[in-house]
C-alpha cells in the first residue's frame, strides 16, 4: 500500500526542479491518490558560487543539506543528479533507485561548428576538472575558464565573459529543452563522462519499507549496474565529485564494459583503461579497473591533486 503523501526534497535550480517534477509526475501517474509535494533546499554548492568547486573541498556539496532534512523527517525522498552523489551515505540513508540514463555525453555550446574548429588559444568555460583535463589533453592550446552557476547562467557566460565555448552535460540541456544551443556532442570515448552522468538517483530512509516499495519502479537495472560500477571505481580511488576521475559503463547482452580515466588537471598525465565482465560483477569490475588505473600512475596524479596521500 503506497503512502498517502510523499515529500520530495530537491535543490532549487531549474534543472533540479525539472528532475524532481518528473519524479513527482511519474509517482502521480502510478498512484493517482497520492499527494506529492516538493521541498526546495539550498545546499552549500548552491550558496558558494564565487569559488571553483574543487577549492570548496569536501564531498556532498549538493546533497548534504537535503540529507539532513531527510534525517530530521522533513522529507521522504530526495532526487539527485547521480554525478553529484557521494559514494558514502549518512547512517540510515541510501540510494534506492537509479533511473534510466539520459544522454551521458558532454556537449559543446559555442559559436564554432565543432570542438575541433575552435581557434588556437580559445577560451573554454567548464566547472569540471574531469572535462578540463580531457580537453587539454586533446588541445593543450586551450585556455580553460572556471565557470559556476546553473545551466542558463553558464550559457549566458559564453557572451558575458567573452568565451569561445562552454562544455555542459548533454542530459541537462535536453531536459531543459536547450538542445538548439548545442554545436556538438562529444563522443564518450573522447570525453569520458562524470561518474553517473545522465542518471538520476532517488535517496530515502532505508528503514521505511512503505516508501521504498512505492519508488522501486524507478530503478532501471542496466543503468543501475553501469552506475554502480562507475561509483565503485570512484570509491576505490577515494575520489569526490570534483576530481579529474571519469568512468562510463555500458551493458550489452549481460556484459558490462567499463572505461575509466585518471588525469592531471593540465591533461599532460593521462591514465586510461577499460575492463569487461559479467554485469552481476559490476562493483568488482569497477574496483579492479580502479586498481589498474592507480597502479599505472593514477595514484601519483591524485596525490598531486589532493596534495596529500590517498
UniProtKB/Swiss-Prot annotation:
It catalyses: 4 porphobilinogen + H2O = hydroxymethylbilane + 4 NH4(+). Pathway: Porphyrin-containing compound metabolism; protoporphyrin-IX biosynthesis; coproporphyrinogen-III from 5-aminolevulinate: step 2/4. GO terms for molecular function: hydroxymethylbilane synthase activity. Its EC number is 2.5.1.61. GO terms for cellular component: cytoplasm. Keywords: Porphyrin biosynthesis, Transferase. The modification S-(dipyrrolylmethanemethyl)cysteine is found at residue 241. It is an enzyme of class 2 (transferase). InterPro entries: HemC, Porphobilin_deaminase_cofac_BS, Porphobilin_deaminase_N, Porphobilinogen_deaminase_C, Porphobilinogen_deaminase_C_sf. It comes from the Bacteria. Pfam families: Porphobil_deam (PF01379), Porphobil_deamC (PF03900). GO terms for biological process: protoporphyrinogen IX biosynthetic process. Its cofactor is dipyrromethane. Binds 1 dipyrromethane group covalently. Belongs to the HMBS family. Tetrapolymerization of the monopyrrole PBG into the hydroxymethylbilane pre-uroporphyrinogen in several discrete steps. Monomer. The porphobilinogen subunits are added to the dipyrromethane group. This is Porphobilinogen deaminase. It comes from Pelobacter propionicus (strain DSM 2379 / NBRC 103807 / OttBd1). The gene is hemC.
Amino acid at each position: 500500500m503506497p503512502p498517502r503523501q510523499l515529500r520530495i526534497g530537491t535543490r532549487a535550480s531549474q534543472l533540479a526542479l525539472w528532475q524532481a517534477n518528473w519524479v513527482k509526475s511519474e509517482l502521480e501517474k502510478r498512484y493517482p491518490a497520492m499527494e506529492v509535494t516538493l521541498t526546495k533546499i539550498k545546499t552549500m554548492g548552491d550558496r558558494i558560487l564565487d569559488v571553483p568547486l574543487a577549492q570548496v573541498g569536501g564531498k556532498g556539496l549538493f546533497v548534504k543539506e537535503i540529507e539532513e532534512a531527510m534525517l530530521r523527517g522533513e522529507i521522504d525522498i530526495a532526487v539527485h543528479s547521480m554525478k553529484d552523489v557521494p559514494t558514502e551515505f549518512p547512517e540510515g540513508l541510501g540510494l534506492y533507485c537509479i533511473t534510466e540514463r539520459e544522454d551521458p555525453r558532454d556537449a559543446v555550446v559555442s559559436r564554432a561548428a565543432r570542438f575541433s574548429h575552435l581557434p588556437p588559444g580559445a577560451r573554454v568555460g567548464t566547472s569540471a576538472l574531469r572535462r578540463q583535463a580531457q580537453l587539454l589533453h586533446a588541445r593543450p592550446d586551450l585556455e580553460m575558464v572556471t565557470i559556476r552557476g546553473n545551466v542558463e547562467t553558464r550559457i549566458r557566460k559564453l557572451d558575458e565573459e567573452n568565451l569561445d565555448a562552454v562544455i555542459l552535460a548533454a542530459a541537462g540541456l535536453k531536459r531543459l529543452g536547450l538542445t538548439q544551443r548545442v554545436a556538438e556532442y562529444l563522443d564518450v570515448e573522447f570525453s569520458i563522462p562524470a561518474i553517473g552522468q545522465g542518471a538520476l538517483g532517488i535517496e530515502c530512509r532505508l528503514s521505511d519499507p512503505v516508501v521504498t516499495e512505492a519508488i522501486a519502479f524507478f530503478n532501471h537495472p542496466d543503468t543501475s549496474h553501469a552506475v554502480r560500477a562507475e561509483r565503485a571505481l570512484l570509491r576505490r580511488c577515494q575520489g569526490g565529485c570534483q576530481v579529474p576521475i571519469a568512468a562510463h559503463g555500458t551493458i550489452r547482452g549481460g556484459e558490462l564494459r567499463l572505461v575509466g580515466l585518471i588525469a592531471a588537471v593540465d591533461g599532460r598525465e593521462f591514465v586510461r583503461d577499460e575492463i569487461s565482465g559479467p554485469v552481476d560483477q559490476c562493483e568488482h569490475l569497477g574496483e579492479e579497473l580502479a586498481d589498474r588505473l592507480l597502479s599505472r600512475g593514477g595514484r601519483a596524479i591524485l596525490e598531486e591533486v589532493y596534495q596529500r596521500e590517498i
